[in-house]
Each structure stands twice: as structure tokens, then as C-alpha cells.
Amino acid sequence: MQYTLWDIISRVESNGNLKALRFEPEYYQRRMERGDWDNSIIQNIRAANKCSLGTARMIYCSSWGAVQIMGFNLYLNGAFNLSVAHFMENEAYQVNEFRRFLLKNGLTEYTPERLASDKAARVKFAKVYNGAESYADLILQACQFYGVK
């Protein structure tokens, strides 16, 4: 079977759980302390979810779905204009937004095979996707789980 980057990252992030949700309190606290919110994204979140400012900030600072797309990435530029409830219920929406994230961040050249065999590529991908070099080890474990070489 041919495994995809979606398979690898969803295994790392949520074990494939489309409805996974993680609030990132440290990220939220930093934003609150600095007042460092992208108001256009907040407006997009409020419009799509018909919610309060406080709820929009929670959505902004949470990661959503099988591959844990951060709310601020999900609603960047208004490209996704449905509620997070719709996002969590629909794998096609999640795959599409994952692809959009990869494209926006220059990560489309990475394949499971490359991540399995090239440590430098794995570390680079990990730093962009999750920010932590230790994330590269989790990617390798997922590749090994699926037998990707």
C-alpha cells in the first residue's frame, strides 16, 4: 500500500482522529499578553463560526482535526469559510486544508519516503510543521509503523 503524507502526519498528530482538538494555552497566553492577534483572521473566524470574540480567540489558538491545523492557519486569508464543526466532520475539508498548508509553507516536495530516509529533510519539515526538532522523531516512528522506507 502507498502511504501519503496525510497518513504519516495524521498518525503523529491524532492517530487519525478527524475530531481531535487541542487548545494551546501557552500560545493563547502569549497572544493575550501581547495583544498580538491578526484581526482579519479573528474576523474570518467570527464570521464562519458566528461566535463571540473570546470563542474566536480560542479557535485561533487551537489545533483541529486529524493533522491538527491551527485555527489561525485554517482561517488565514478567508480561504476556509465554514465552521470548525464542519471541518471536524469532513475528511475532505481536512485534506484540502492540509494541502493548502503544505503549499503555503513550501512543504509539497516532501514524501513519506523522503521523510523516512532523509533526516535533514525530516528535521526541516518538522520545524516548519510543528516547530520542534523532536517532532522529526515522531515522523520517523510513523514512517516505520507504516513500513515506509
Swiss-Prot record:
Temperature dependence: Inactivation temperature above 4 degrees Celsius.
Reaction catalysed by this enzyme: Hydrolysis of (1->4)-beta-linkages between N-acetylmuramic acid and N-acetyl-D-glucosamine residues in a peptidoglycan and between N-acetyl-D-glucosamine residues in chitodextrins
EC numbers: 3.2.1.17
Topological relation to the membrane, as annotated: Peripheral membrane protein
Taxonomic superkingdom: Viruses
Stored InterPro entries: Muramidase, Phage_PRD1_P15_lysozyme
Record key words, sorted: Antimicrobial, Bacteriolytic enzyme, Cytolysis, Glycosidase, Host cell lysis by virus, Hydrolase, Membrane, Viral release from host cell, Virion
pH dependence per the entry: Optimum pH is 7.0-8.0.
First-listed, main subcellular location of the protein, grouped into a coarse class: virion
EC supergroup of this enzyme: hydrolase
Subcellular localization, as worded in the UniProt entry: Virion membrane
GO biological process, one term: viral release from host cell by cytolysis
A single cellular component GO annotation: membrane
A molecular function GO annotation: lysozyme activity
TM stretches of this protein: none
Main function: Endolysin involved in host peptidoglycan digestion after permeabilization of the cytoplasmic membrane by holin. Involved in host cell lysis and liberation of progeny phages. Displays strong lytic activity against chloroform-treated Gram-negative cells.
The protein, known as: Endolysin
Organism: Enterobacteria phage PRD1 (Bacteriophage PRD1)
